[in-house]
């Protein structure tokens, strides 16, 4: 009993300082030591401090898809990277998923201070279903969602801005999907102007921006850059800017997933 009393009598500020130096896996283990430790390590202020500290020593995260779920591995990101990786977590799919094809996007709720993962998967019967996972909770569990419009996530990088997650999708037409991470509600914006492969989302001063690169039909060189900025989500009002690009010599590498241009160092 005396050892237990000494064990739990560590001052909170000292305990937090020590815990901030641990790995996330060690933090999870410490939460099981005692109710007192769990109450401290589950606090929102500790989570924010831990994320801030961890971001100063970033790690690369790898996910391997297996029949039973996703297996995560991580490796320190340093100037002299090692090929060694650590086993991080094994997360099973929801038993109802019955996967044929799946896509994952993540977003952050700045009010609730929560990271969430949105999973969209195509089942064997060709039906698209949606699941949501809230990270940092005691019981990591996928929750099935009801989406008002069946849609297929489309080629392109998702972007999270001020608690709203944006990604491209298509039904019978091309869409920009807006997903509120906190309320978990969908909105669908007309995306017909962006329906080609040369476009990306950008964060334009806290607003959603979409860039679209137009290329010459003859030689394939970039001709102009179009930038749309979403001014009003409810009214679907966009402002548009068009920049004409000078015709310069470029070398391009392109395949189904990569499009890169090598430009002169001085312009």
UniProtKB/Swiss-Prot annotation:
Pfam families given in the database record: F-box, FBA_3
The F-box domain, residue ranges: 4-53
Protein name as annotated: Putative F-box protein At5g38810
Organism: Arabidopsis thaliana (Mouse-ear cress)
UniProt lineage: Eukaryota, Viridiplantae, Streptophyta, Embryophyta, Tracheophyta
């Amino acid at each position: 009993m005396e050892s237990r009393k000494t064990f739990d009598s560590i001052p909170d500020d000292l305990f937090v300082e020590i815990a901030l130096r641990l790995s996330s896996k060690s933090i999870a283990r410490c939460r099981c030591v005692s109710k007192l430790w769990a109450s401290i390590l589950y606090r929102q202020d500790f989570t924010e401090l831990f994320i801030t500290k961890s971001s100063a020593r970033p790690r690369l995260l790898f996910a391997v898809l297996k029949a039973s779920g996703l297996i995560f591995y991580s490796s320190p990101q340093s100037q002299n990277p090692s090929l060694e990786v650590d086993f991080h977590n094994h997360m099973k799919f929801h038993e109802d998923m019955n996967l044929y094809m799946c896509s994952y996007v993540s977003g952050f709720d700045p009010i609730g201070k929560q990271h969430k993962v949105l999973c969209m998967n195509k089942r064997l019967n060709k039906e698209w279903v949606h699941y949501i996972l809230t990270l940092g909770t005691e019981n990591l569990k996928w929750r099935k969602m009801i989406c008002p419009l069946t849609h297929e996530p489309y080629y392109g990088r998702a972007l999270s801005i001020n608690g709203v997650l944006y990604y491209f999708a298509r039904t019978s037409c091309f869409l920009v999907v807006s997903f509120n991470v906190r309320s978990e509600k969908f909105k669908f914006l007309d995306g017909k102007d962006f329906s080609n492969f040369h476009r990306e989302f950008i964060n334009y001063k806290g607003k959603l921006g979409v860039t679209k690169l137009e290329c010459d039909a003859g030689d394939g060189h970039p001709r102009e850059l179009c930038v749309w900025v979403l001014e009003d989500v409810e009214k679907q009002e966009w402002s548009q800017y068009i920049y004409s690009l000078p015709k310069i010599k470029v070398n391009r590498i392109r395949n189904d997933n990569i499009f890169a241009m090598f430009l002169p160092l001085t312009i």
